[in-house]
Regions:
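Non-catalytic structural scaffold of enzyme domains
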Residues: 1-195
Length: 195
């Protein structure tokens, strides 16, 4: 049986060994991983010709950017509601002036959780990677001393003198994405075989 070649782009260092550990449970999988986000992830993905990998797995804005620049199918690692609840709870235990700075599809869910669970956490949204720095500065100027966000937000938060908590994806979320990548590869091959 031919192995499925997946490129895993981990947005933070701890995800890379998690991806490799999950991949061990699949006999038909050849996983290549590296840690990177946005520009360095795109440079890495572009270094490989299209179709060198069967599927690329990544998260957030990095997955969106890689998808727009590459013909290889991209599966996005999800951030579950439990992942968000975990980091929000931790943030509120550390500071009463905590805020989430992320894409609107994340901050909308945080606002829903905050309203439902009566949590006092503010959100600041951005839509493109180019907006991250200004959004973090806006958050810091508003007096928030702990910023919760993705890997690309970290450096800007630290530069503003804020504490930072990373939104991480659970093992279950990463595992589901790898499984989805395998299923997507099989589906594409089935369609190509019929043509």
């Amino acid at each position: 049986m031919e192995k499925i070649k997946i490129l895993g782009i981990a947005p933070y260092q701890e995800m890379e060994p998690l991806m490799r550990d999950i991949a061990k449970s699949y006999d038909n999988l050849e996983l290549y991983t590296f840690t990177g986000f946005y520009k360095n992830a795109i440079q890495f993905a572009k270094a490989f010709p299209d179709k060198e990998f069967d599927v690329i797995v990544s998260r957030g804005g990095t997955a969106d950017l890689v998808r727009s620049l590459n013909d290889t199918p991209v599966v996005k690692i999800k951030v579950s509601t439990l992942d968000l609840l975990r980091v929000i709870t931790q943030a509120l235990q550390c500071s009463s002036r905590a805020a989430v700075v992320s894409y609107s599809y994340i901050t909308d869910r945080v606002e829903m959780l905050a309203k439902f669970l009566r949590l006092d956490i503010r959100t600041f949204s951005f839509e493109t990677p180019e907006q991250i720095e200004d959004t973090v500065k806006q958050c810091a100027r508003a007096g928030y001393d702990l910023i919760v966000g993705g890997a690309a937000t970290r450096d800007y938060a630290v530069a503003e003198g804020a504490q930072f908590l990373l939104i991480t994806s659970s093992r279950e979320s990463v595992e589901a994405s790898i499984q989805q990548a395998i299923e997507q590869h099989h589906l594409i091959n089935d369609v190509l075989d019929k043509n």
